[in-house]
Amino acid sequence: MKKNILANLISQNIDIAKKANYKILLKQKNTHLSIKPYTKPDIKVSVITCTNRPRYMKNVLENYHRQLYRDKELIIILNDNKMKINEWTTITNSYPDITVFQVDEKKSLGYCLNYAIEKAKYNVIAKLDDDDYYGPEYLSQAVNALKYADVVGKYCTYVYFEESKTLAIRNPKRENQYVYRLEGPTLVFRKEIFNTVKFKDKSLGEDIQFCKDCLKKGIKLYATDKHNYVYIRHGSKDKHAWNIKDELYKKLCIIIGEVEDYISFIEYTKTKNSHKK
């Protein structure tokens, strides 16, 4: 089982022949999309978050409000029929840049993401998870990286194990380079991509499939560095998309150590790829 998990972790989800072709593609410009480089007045971001867990309302809003990037909106999709939308709108109605929608729980995560993108007003989409941590410079760094590719995000990330208070790094040496996949909670892309690639109608692996489909269409993926984001492992309190126990997951990471405050480790506000508006 461990060998299978290790193979799954390091897999780039693309066969050898396609990898060779992609290496050639990475040296070429994205001329097929004819998307002009952004100028400052054009760069506005639609942050989308899908959740079926009411307890993360505070975290969703804090991640958004923490961002130093000013020109943005937040679209929240509630994907559980038991969730009371009025409990969210009572708080969000005072913020004109935040909109909340409720989608039937029978609909997949991929469906919800596509729904949110259709509602988005701006020309950059940033997919944020409900339970992770996004530092103040997260959006600024991601937006600036769009000059390298039409889809950006992180492959190497910090991981924080809440129960043991352990900070670690996964997928090391996958920073500031073109890659074959990106971590789902860190996907940031130009909205024009949605005309070519959409999320598949499923709730597991929709982010990996999105990356695969981008590659098939000749759309490059660029990974920034690991700073400004932490993947939070909540232990037994939550069911994660990848159902693997913490102790086994730690063996797939580089352990930094036991820390109470991981924020001081992961925030890097002097990033070269910083863009403040």
Specify the residue positions occupied by each region the protein language model found.
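N-proximal low-complexity "stem/linker" segments adjacent to membrane-targeting elements
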Residues: 1-66
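Acidic donor-binding loop at a coil-to-helix junction in glycosyltransferase catalytic cores
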Residues: 204-210, 219
